[in-house]
Amino acid sequence: MANLVKEANEQLKEVIMKAMGMAVADGKFEPVPLPPFTIEIPNDKSHGDFAANVAMVCAKALKMNPRQIATILMERMIFDGTYFERCEMAGPGFLNF
C-alpha cells in the first residue's frame, strides 16, 4: 500500500509540474523559482483522496491570487496514464484529487 501511495504522489507531482511548465510556456506564469509544495492524504475524505497546497505556497512568488493559480493549473492538467481522473479546487486554493 505504501508503494501505491508513493507512486500516486509522484504522479500528482509530475502532473502539477507539467501544468506549471505549460502555464509558463503560455505566458500565464512568470518563470520564477517556486517554493516546495506538499501533496498529502487529507483527513477529511470529502477533500479528495489527495490534496496539494501548490497554489497557496506559490502565490507570493507568482504575485497572483491562489485561486487564480489553481484555476490556471487545473486547465492544464493531463491525467493520462495516472491513477487520477480530475482535480477540484477547494477553499483558498487547495487542489483536491
Each model region followed by its residue ranges:
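N-terminal alpha-helical targeting/anchoring segments
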Residues: 1-96
